[in-house]
Amino acid sequence: LVDAAHVAGLGIIMDWVPGHFIKNTDMLAQFDGTPTFEYTDPHRAENVRWGTWNFDLGKAQVQSFLISSAMYWLDHCHLDGLRVDAVSNMLYMDYDAGKENDRNRFGGRDNLEGIAFLKQLNTKVFAKHPDVLMMAEESSAYPKVSAPINTGGLGFNYKWNMGWMNDTLKFFEEDPVYRHSDMNLLTFSFMYMYNEQFVLPFSHDEVVHGKKSLMHKMPGDRYNQFANLRTMYVWQMTFPGKKLLFMGSEWGQFLEWRDWSELEWVDLKDPMNHKMQTFTKTLNHIYTNRPSLWQQDHEPLGTKITMADEPDVMSYIRYGKQKDDFTVVALNFVPVQKDHFRVPVPSLGTYTILLNTENLDFGGTWTKWQATLTARLGDHYGEPAWLDVILPAMGALLIVPKKLQPLPKKLATEHHQRPAA
């Protein structure tokens, strides 16, 4: 199956759970009548949060079993990577309920055996499979999760940005009337976006067990729910970090995910769901074909925040490595159109709108918009020029340069010396 996916151009990354296991007596629990894989101490063995047993990651047989498991999936099943589940549970002594006062032999809260195991795991994996992806689902502020081991890191390629995900969903679930006072939910992520190499996840965990689907989380009537969803996806696809979107979310499935049932494929007969799928497909193609949206995800020069202190709106610029390769992002988080909205840009010349979320083909109402935008000289939010645009209600624009012109010499020198935010 994995090989067939590879032929079709698909990579496969599997959810892998090395931190804890089920209590069934026909599985690993009390494997030989004694706590073989779990801790001997019942207090440390018990995982109250999930009703499972914690692996004793300090035991040689446990390390061998788990690393052999990982290598089996990579060696024999040809997986392209592993998403390591619940890493926080392996990093801390006091992560679980009832263990708030647990400490290691040095008096700290770090789980020394768990940290050593994760480093050993990544060392073994990359020694044999240097091109696979190892991703940590880790929700704390533990440092250097995605840094190399020889620099003090855990050695993962990427860390899931759970903070970005939680803040984003909290913001977009909110009635737009109140969003102006909660813009910090979005802007706070800019403060730590380079701390790790991040994945921005809208995963299965957020659309199950009564949490509702992404579509169902959105406020307003059906039209505005789709508009919110399109805008949120632009925010995700243009924010620094790799992207993850759970199946069914690409067309706005209304029911949350049920592991005993297939997706609501019938939704695609609805014009709005079909248009939502078209939008997601278009956004994906734009992302893959514009290096400025991904080439410098982890470099400060790759993102410049131009407007983040205004109520209800935001603007920033993503830069690629090539000269004049940049994408301007303008977002409107309320259902009120912004006429003559000034978008800061770094250069004079002409620009074009690459994506308008309110395009009729995507489920919006717009059939036409400004074909060419001409930048006007004048300092605006630290940029030397600005564009006069109509920013759609509850929508977003992606704007790209068409034909740029040099700035006046004095301005060019001044702005060349300004570091990217």
Question: What is the meaning of each model-derived region?
Answer:
Residues 223-226, 237-245, 249-421:
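Carbohydrate-interacting/catalytic domains
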Residues 5, 15, 66, 73, ...:
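Conserved, mostly hydrophobic/aromatic
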Residues 1-11, 60-65, 112-119, 224-227, ...:
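Aromatic- and glycine-enriched glycan-recognition loops and surfaces
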Residues 1-110, 389:
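Substrate-binding/active-site clefts of carbohydrate-active enzymes
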Residues 31-47, 108-226, 230-238, 281, ...:
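Glycan-recognition surfaces
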